[in-house]
Amino acid sequence: MVQLDRFEILFNNPEQAYFAGQEISGKVIIENKEPKKVNEILLELKGRARTYWTKHSGKSRKHCSHSEPYFLEQFNPGYTHKFTVVKDGKEKERILPAGIHQVPFSYTLPKSLPSSFEGEFGHIRYTCKAICERPWDFDIVSRKAFTVVGIEDINSDPKLNEPATCVESNHAVTFCCRSAGSVTGEIRISKCGYTPGEKIDVSFKVINLSSKTRTTALRFVQQTTYKAKTFAGHEHIKNVVRVISKIDKGEVPGGSTTEWQEESITIPSLPPKLGKCKILSVTYSVELEVEQTLTVPCPIVIGSIPQLSQLLIHSKQSVQSAGNGSLPKSSIKDSPPKWDSESCVQVTITDESGQLVEELGNEMEALLSARKRVRMPSSILSELYPTMPSPYYKESFFGASDISEEKEQAQFGEASFAPKYPFYTD
């Protein structure tokens, strides 16, 4: 039976979204109207990828699953120690007084994390969990997910800023193996690397040398690949294709050629490539679809760090527009929230058990440095990309997913979660 009126995790960043390598900080809020017996208030930060599905073959079933851990930090801030009741020189119990209690925490995320992802057969998920241990009773748990954005830099590959052309042909065959004429599709894009919010400029052409009229469409597609293993260790792969958007482009009569110039597709809030995950991958493509004949895919890459030279030009144009009093309304509405540095809690340094360094002495300094457990405010984006404007965030195009887990039941916290991804343009 839950015996706390409030047990909530609050992050100092209201977006609850962090780039890999940044510091995550916040506090646990405990509210109780009456004094409560407790042992400890514990904290756990976890990040991992997981895949799972059931493979059916006749009457038999094979459960496939795999996981890839990234970090698991557990520490005890020692908040309840000051409420210890001592009788006859012996510690008896800890009584949490009635009122509102705040337990601050901070942790610097590893730099090599992949982005948060929620899919049909797996996820990459990052969570913070607070545990109230009670004597001779069940623990009370509060759990909250947050977004991590992996550093996937479009600038790292110059080819991603170059145009691309993809061509496919299909020779139709009719009765008695007679040729019915070929259909050729060609698709051209202005560049191959993007971030959410950017527009893909597409030009395409269909050469229909068959006798049949063909309908055409332009599709923006996401393909997710999940890798898992059975209990016996056999690896299985599952591919899932999602159509993000589709634009019908009309018909191409037999014996004719039709061409379209600069059709635009705006990229919604989608996860960037998961380059640092071994069991999950996400790829994207723009496809020209010709009815019952062929599909011409043109791969693109979605990253989390945009092409900086173009972004700076766009930013200067936005500033000039603002100076002329013509700032678009959307720029005002979607501008990133201001970070209140004064609201951040004090940075702490902890050992493996969560004890403060000040309580352990100076001899721990070298060990903590070696283990990279120094809790320091991170400005990784400003260090790596000093000219890059701050992003703002939007929830995933696919909406929220159920994140409740049978093995990690929580009495407090949200059962659903939608990752957020960075935008740099309006």
Swiss-Prot record:
Q: Any phenotype upon disruption?
A: Viable. Shows defects in several behavioral responses, including abnormal avoidance response to the chemoattractant lysine and impaired adaptability induced by prior exposure to high concentration of fructose. Delay in egg-laying upon refeeding after starvation. Slight decrease in brood size.
Q: How is it modified after translation?
A: Phosphorylated. Dephosphorylated by tax-6 in vitro.
Report biased composition (Polar residues) as residue ranges: 320-329
Keyword Electron transport included in the entry's annotation:
no
The protein's matches in SUPFAM superfamilies, at most eight in alphabetical order, are given as: E set domains
| Disordered: annotated span | 320-340
Described purpose of this protein according to its UniProt entry:
Involved in several behavioral responses including chemotaxis towards lysine and adaptation to repeated osmotic stress. In addition, plays a role in resuming egg-laying and locomotion after starvation.
Name of this chain's protein: Arrestin domain-containing protein 17
Q: Which organism is it from?
A: Caenorhabditis elegans
Q: Provide the taxonomic classification.
A: Eukaryota, Metazoa, Ecdysozoa, Nematoda, Chromadorea
